[in-house]
């Protein structure tokens, strides 16, 4: 029994499922999760000190790689002055100004402690601003574990939502409408039916929780038009895509301006940070200046602000996103070529520093949740464990996006592709 197996056995006696977030349990791939004790650059090291090339990056935050010196220095320096005050600090202002500089649509913003808090608060704000109850989300898009968002489609696109988890009252979930991602016609149909009842659309501009599925041409533009037509709020959930698809997020990459934006992951540089913001007139509805309540003991925590500010400052220097995009393309296309050499049918998607691959015979681009669910999950499980044995750590679920960092050099990507070629040959 290795150290991870020992720790997992111990953890299950005190922590539900042995983990503090379900996907970490390896239920999607089987086997024992790797317990990590340290990380550096593009590598993580398990409890037995085995090294892995890391394409999870703490599920997205580590865009500069692990243990970046600028972030560590900022955290250590700030921590010497105190860990938390529960009062305003200057660094909160500096951080907010930096975010607005990079994401101009966020004219005003509020810091929180997680992406879930950000999306939950943005939806409450949209409801308060519009005076409407219903929200529209997309099948396969994840926006955190707030009750209103753990909802899947009922029987048909135009039916009311039903809960996707025990503990969510159906009477509450009925206010969440769900339609197919990348299908603007369904959006128009449901708005025609519910018209002035819908407070907002919330969308991952690049869907990252059904693997990696970019928007089809015209989809985001269509959402903007529908929201304008019906005076609903367009919320871009950029918790995953923010500062990763482009320096200004997916909204900069696709040149679409939402009314509200939610951020997380990269904005914290590895610390627990989220944010939501947008049009000044909407943000003026949030307490203490407006009637919509939102609060948080650790919101704007100085250590987290320091880490996030250092991360964004470093990320904005040079042409890092051009390098990230090139590296991601090299990896994704290299995986596809390696699969083809070994007679394995593989579809790949990538945008910015996000990538995904699907074991499928479908020759069409993967653009929908339905297509993603029809891919070969069993083959992914085998490939995942083969790659793990080769020292490559992929997301332990076929529905999760992969992430690159500036620490993923050409040599590291080439090493990954050599391992992949070997693993595809064994499928």
UniProtKB/Swiss-Prot annotation:
Record PTM N6-(pyridoxal phosphate)lysine, positions in chain: 265
Reaction equation(s) it catalyzes: (S)-4-amino-5-oxopentanoate = 5-aminolevulinate
Metabolic or biological pathway: Porphyrin-containing compound metabolism; protoporphyrin-IX biosynthesis; 5-aminolevulinate from L-glutamyl-tRNA(Glu): step 2/2
Enzyme Commission code(s) on record: 5.4.3.8
Keyword Transit peptide belongs to the record: no
Pfam families named among the record's database cross-references: Aminotran_3 (PF00202)
Disulfide bonds: none
Keyword vocabulary terms for this entry: Cytoplasm, Isomerase, Porphyrin biosynthesis, Pyridoxal phosphate
Protein's UniProt keywords contain Isomerase: yes
Gene Ontology molecular function: any one: pyridoxal phosphate binding
Major localisation: cytoplasm
InterPro entries the record matches: 4pyrrol_synth_GluAld_NH2Trfase (IPR004639), Aminotrans_3 (IPR005814), Aminotrans_3_PPA_site (IPR049704), PyrdxlP-dep_Trfase (IPR015424), PyrdxlP-dep_Trfase_major (IPR015421), PyrdxlP-dep_Trfase_small (IPR015422)
Biological-process GO terms, alphabetical: protoporphyrinogen IX biosynthetic process
Entry coiled-coil feature ranges: none
Cofactor(s) in the UniProt record: pyridoxal 5'-phosphate
Location relative to the cell: Cytoplasm
One GO cellular component term noted in the UniProt record for this chain: cytoplasm
Source organism superkingdom: Bacteria
Family statement: Belongs to the class-III pyridoxal-phosphate-dependent aminotransferase family. HemL subfamily.
Assembly and oligomerization: Homodimer.
Protein's UniProt name: Glutamate-1-semialdehyde 2,1-aminomutase
Lineage: Bacteria, Pseudomonadati, Pseudomonadota, Gammaproteobacteria, Alteromonadales
Gene: hemL
